[in-house]
């Protein structure tokens, strides 16, 4: 899995990059055929936003989450992606 992390109006610190890498590596337990991940971390006034696009075998998955701080937004994003990956995996098993 290749991670591409970018920031808009926020500096990506090494600690934040390590946190994102650790969280996204846990997604492989839900679906092991994740090819590329594009992550955009944004700050808009008081809201922290985390967006992700996953290129997986059989399609693409997109999710977005907001939080009071960036780490909470990333945690929410991981929860959404885990649900979507489980649903995608079940859909592929049915065919």
Swiss-Prot record:
InterPro entries in UniProt: HPF/YfiA_ribosome-assoc, RHF-like, RHF/RaiA
GO CC terms of this entry: cytosolic small ribosomal subunit
Gene3D superfamilies (UniProt xref): Ribosome hibernation promotion factor-like
Assigned keywords, A-Z: Translation regulation
GO molecular function, one term: ribosomal small subunit binding
Pfam families referenced in this protein's UniProt entry, alphabetically: Ribosomal_S30AE
A biological-process GO annotation: negative regulation of translational elongation
Superkingdom of the source species: Bacteria
Family indicated by similarity: Belongs to the HPF/YfiA ribosome-associated protein family. Short HPF subfamily.
Assembly information from the UniProt record: Associates exclusively with 100S ribosomes, which are dimers of 70S ribosomes.
Function field: During stationary phase, promotes and stabilizes dimerization of 70S ribosomes by the ribosome modulation factor (RMF), leading to the formation of inactive 100S ribosomes.
Name under which the protein is recorded: Ribosome hibernation promoting factor
Organism: Klebsiella oxytoca
């Amino acid at each position: 899995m290749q991670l591409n992390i970018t920031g808009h109006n926020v500096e990506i610190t090494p600690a934040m990059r390590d946190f994102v890498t650790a969280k996204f590596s846990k997604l492989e337990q839900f679906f092991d055929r994740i090819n590329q991940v594009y992550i955009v971390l944004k700050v808009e006034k008081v809201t922290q936003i985390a967006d992700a696009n996953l290129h997986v075998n059989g399609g693409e998955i997109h999710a977005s989450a907001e939080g009071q701080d960036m780490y909470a937004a990333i945690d929410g994003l991981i929860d959404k992606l885990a649900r979507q990956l489980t649903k995608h995996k079940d859909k592929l098993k049915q065919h």
